[in-house]
């Protein structure tokens, strides 16, 4: 049995799909980011191979992959009555993927769409990166990240980065770390903020903070100032966050997104003025600062949002239909 964390959800989805269809399902088209890992083709290939192996262990025998932004393009194409040159921006929780694709009602009938895909690119920037930056800017100073030692040195940075990074939170509450935290606390010129940090760890409140920060990021899309209630992590703990603070905090990520967008456009061989539509999908594409980066680089494109969380899935279903339906006789559930 595989040790991959992806096995259980893939197996569950296959069983659910078979129950719905009333037949065994052996074929699958799985979405993948353009790059699992930035700038490392070998590791990227291993990641896809591992995911394919896990899918086969979960019961699929014929496993194919499609880039997630291409799946989003297929979803958008399904709604069109004319040809368009589309820039697809699929920015989710962990990755930002971009494609330039020619789409249209006649093109969707073609068996081979390779020539319609003018460029693909992607980077590992997504919602979790923005969450981490917001947490570091709005929450961690209240837990000691800006505090000094009795000799006026900065506190170590890693405890705060790990607490702000959702997949690192569970690593903090070890006896070794708690000993280290006590030593840091004893050396603090003002111990109060770091005492609060230690309390968060003792109460296992890190994931509560992460959840509240994710919601704060969403709320700051529609309001300028919010109070983030962190009392689930520490009683009475609340912090103020502003849109301006958030946008300053994510400046590095915005710059990386800008570079990847420009690189994708350059690779396509087309000018920004040639793009007729900017199609947005993935929850992070709804962040106003992210939208602003896209609209600045593609000023003439008509921006349209798909289903932010389901466009890729629908496009993968269309791709599976194109690849498998002509050769498979599917028995409908009764």
Named regions from a protein language model:
Residues 88-97, 126-128, 213, 282-284:
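A short acidic Gly-Thr/Ser loop motif
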Residues 30, 96, 173-183, 281-286:
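Core structural elements
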Residues 82-91, 145, 321-334:
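A polyampholytic, Gly/Pro-enriched intrinsically disordered region
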Residues 19-23, 144-148, 215-226, 263, ...:
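Intrinsically disordered or highly flexible coil/loop and linker segments, enriched in small
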Residues 102-232:
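Phosphate-binding glycine-rich/basic clefts of nucleotide- and phosphate-handling proteins
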Residues 136-140, 144, 296, 300, ...:
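Short, well-ordered loop/turn and helix-capping segments at boundaries between secondary-structure elements
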Residues 1-87, 104-123, 238-268, 277-279, ...:
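N-terminal phosphate-binding loop and flanking beta/alpha elements of the actin-like ATPase fold
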Residues 23-24, 80, 91-95, 207, ...:
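Short flexible coil/turn linkers enriched for glycine and charged/polar residues
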